[in-house]
């Protein structure tokens, strides 16, 4: 249930540095980091059930699905699934010419976005979107963004 992706862009995240330093437990090296990748499907595995096709533009992010059976999943807390597979940590990520990813990890890139624009949305974009979504702020409200690092900069977009 995997696809091979020709990587066109991969954003840099602080988690990639943590991966490089070996601070995530259980990482097997060598490992290519990169969990904010975008590119084109190069090959589709025989057992892929969703109708992904070669040539489709896709992106892969931090969260790539859940097992549905562990304690976290049974509580509905899918993001903390015991068996989650994270690109760049569980398997080689997007800091390579090609990567192999679970088909369940893919997001289709809209035509109006380039790979360079789409890749950072897969972690930094989701992180800042969820912060705003959960803040209670509404259209027209004034908000303060503290810090203008990578996430603060993305939030300003």
Predicted segments, located by residue:
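Glycine-rich beta-strand-centered segment in the early N-terminal region that forms part
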Residues: 1-10, 23-71, 105-116
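Cys/His-rich metal-chelating microdomains
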Residues: 10, 16, 61, 73-76, ...
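Conserved Rossmann-like nucleotide-binding pocket used by diverse enzymes
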Residues: 13, 40, 144
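Cytochrome P450 core scaffold surrounding the K-helix E-X-X-R motif
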Residues: 15-21
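Generic hydrophobic/aromatic pocket-lining and core-packing "Φ" positions
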Residues: 16, 132, 156-157
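NAD(P)H dinucleotide-binding glycine-rich loop of Rossmann-like/cofactor-binding domains
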Residues: 66-146
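Hydrophobic/small residue at the entry helix of a nucleotide-binding pocket
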Residues: 127, 151-152
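Terminal helix/beta-alpha structural elements that buttress the NAD(P)+-binding lobe
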Residues: 142, 154-157
């Amino acid at each position: 249930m995997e696809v091979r992706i020709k990587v066109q862009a991969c954003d840099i995240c602080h988690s990639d540095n943590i991966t490089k330093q070996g601070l995530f437990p259980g990482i097997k090296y060598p490992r290519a980091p990169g969990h904010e990748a975008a590119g084109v499907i190069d090959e589709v595995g025989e057992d892929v059930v969703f109708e992904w096709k070669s040539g489709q533009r896709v992106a892969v992010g931090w969260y790539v699905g859940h097992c549905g059976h562990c304690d976290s999943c049974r509580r509905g807390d899918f993001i903390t699934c015991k068996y989650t597979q994270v690109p760049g940590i569980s398997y080689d990520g997007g800091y390579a010419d090609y990567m192999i990813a679970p088909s369940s990890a893919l997001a289709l890139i809209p035509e109006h976005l380039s790979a360079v624009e789409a890749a950072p949305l897969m972690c930094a974009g989701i992180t800042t979107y969820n912060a705003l979504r959960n803040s209670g702020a509404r259209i027209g409200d004034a908000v303060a963004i503290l810090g203008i690092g990578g996430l603060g900069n993305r939030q300003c977009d």
